[in-house]
């Protein structure tokens, strides 16, 4: 028997991480097992009294919304990212639509959206989305997506198709987009978006620059700022927006410094919310920020010149986005 055969026969069975199937959607431990940064477990903190999730009421539209989404083959980030506010939002007949599939090309360890090799774009999705929005009679919608690093334009044209077809069927509906970073294809993506810009342009900074390597592998802090500033330069009448999580190990001063950077890059609207780990296989919560600190962030935001700041433990980027835009005078 050859040495090669001896080595082969004595190998241990492959672990799940080694049996990697790029076409399968990976979540939780399967997703985070392959990122270059090891997740270091921390003592699980007890949730404080101010962390409260509103459940859907008995007479809500929760199941109606779910049925309509499934009938139209649509995905929401509310479901895919395990958002704690899903009961309240679906119950009120609102949802944040997630386009371009349910498999992201990134593996951010704070996020519960699945990772894998994305499927080809669904050419029928913009039409399905537009008809669903019209059926639900929505006055304000948020459209987001997975990262699509496999596409030459990062998915920008698909965004434009969704925006334009929605406006055809629902001309009075305001459209906010929460876009990926289009890293490596920024100019091309912005050129495409300029043909049919949204009513609000949102891209989340997510965390402070010191934690980017750990929390946002594949992303770049300066690039994300540039995306929003360059979009604003090209579309000065369209408000820009960004969001941050707290509880990943940042300091209050680091959050304030990011807010200053946002204003220096012409970002108009701000959201800040408490990070809640989707599972034990995601980045751990290292602190629960007190409501008094959230209030301080909000006060400082208005001093810095943000037109609107939604700041609080359960705030998410698209949570009550219609109210945020209205209070800022944009909707």
UniProtKB/Swiss-Prot annotation:
InterPro entries: Aldolase_TIM, Elp3/MiaA/NifB-like_rSAM, LIAS_N, Lipoyl_synth, rSAM. The gene is lipA. [4Fe-4S] cluster 2 binds at residues 104, 108, 111. Belongs to the radical SAM superfamily. Lipoyl synthase family. This is Lipoyl synthase. Pfam families: LIAS_N, Radical_SAM. Its cofactor is [4Fe-4S] cluster. The keyword Nucleus does not apply. Binds 2 [4Fe-4S] clusters per subunit. One cluster is coordinated with 3 cysteines and an exchangeable S-adenosyl-L-methionine. One of its GO terms (molecular function) is metal ion binding. It comes from Cupriavidus pinatubonensis (strain JMP 134 / LMG 1197). Pathway: Protein modification; protein lipoylation via endogenous pathway; protein N(6)-(lipoyl)lysine from octanoyl-[acyl-carrier-protein]: step 2/2. Residues 89-307 form the Radical SAM core domain. PROSITE patterns: RADICAL_SAM. It is found in: Cytoplasm. Its EC number is 2.8.1.8. Keywords: 4Fe-4S, Cytoplasm, Iron, Iron-sulfur, Metal-binding, S-adenosyl-L-methionine, Transferase.
